[in-house]
Amino acid sequence: MNILVIKSSVNEKKGSYSSHLSDLFIKFYLEIHPDDQIEVYDLNQFGLANTNLTMKNFEDKTFYQKAESDFWINKLRNADKIVFSTSMTNFNYSATTKNFFDAITVPNKTFLLDKNTGKYTGLLKNIQNVQILTAQGAPLGWYPFGNHSALIKQIFEFLGANVRSDFFVLDGTKVAPNNQKPIADFVAQRQNQIKILAENF
């Protein structure tokens, strides 16, 4: 199995809750599947992190080149499963995540549109499962309009991926007493849930 791990938090250098989740998930997964191939990418280390879609670069098509669209699409095509992590930023997923989805959501490469019927068909059917791991400062339910985890799931499904795993949200990271604990300690409180997700992935 080829497992593609994508990290997309803007807090990687300070310490990211969602990346800690991802690392713990992969640790548990490798205990069960030691021979699987794991590729880990922090999107912040690539050009797309600072390349957003604009009127100009959409019209002249330079966005897709600068964001290395084909590189990421090929990574997705060659993956059997995806582990995707990001944090909530201003009620949504990070801008880096938005850039990533703009780069990979490309007609005739990752989806087809039948203009006669209006039907969309995702082309990334090779992806057998996607584990979405997210973090947010607020407890669940504080911002019902900000369901970034569900949106990520729906985008992968639109592109043809089979998302069998439930997404996992580490919530309340910015409220007391959680915000007074080291990141690793707070994440460790949920490790039993993460282990179960890894076992079922």
From Swiss-Prot:
The EC number(s) this enzyme carries: 1.6.5.-, 1.7.1.17
Binding residues for FMN: S9, S16, Y17, S18
Gene3D superfamilies: 3.40.50.360
Cofactor note: Binds 1 FMN per subunit.
Cofactor(s) required, per the database record: FMN
Disulfide bonds, paired cysteine numbers: none
Top-level EC class as recorded in UniProt: oxidoreductase
Reaction catalysis annotation: 2 a quinone + NADH + H(+) = 2 a 1,4-benzosemiquinone + NAD(+); N,N-dimethyl-1,4-phenylenediamine + anthranilate + 2 NAD(+) = 2-(4-dimethylaminophenyl)diazenylbenzoate + 2 NADH + 2 H(+)
One Pfam assignment: Flavodoxin_2
Example GO molecular function: oxidoreductase activity, acting on NAD(P)H, quinone or similar compound as acceptor
UniProt keyword annotations, A-Z: Flavoprotein, FMN, NAD, Oxidoreductase
Cited InterPro entries: Flavodoxin_fold, Flavoprotein-like_sf, FMN-dep_NADH:Q_OxRdtase_AzoR1, NADH:quinone_OxRdtase_FMN_depd
SUPFAM superfamilies tied to this protein: Flavoproteins
Subunit note: Homodimer.
NCBIfam families tied to this protein: PRK01355.1
Family recorded in the similarity comment: Belongs to the azoreductase type 1 family.
Physiological role: Quinone reductase that provides resistance to thiol-specific stress caused by electrophilic quinones.
Protein's name according to its UniProt entry: FMN-dependent NADH:quinone oxidoreductase
Lineage summary: Bacteria, Bacillati, Mycoplasmatota, Mycoplasmoidales, Metamycoplasmataceae
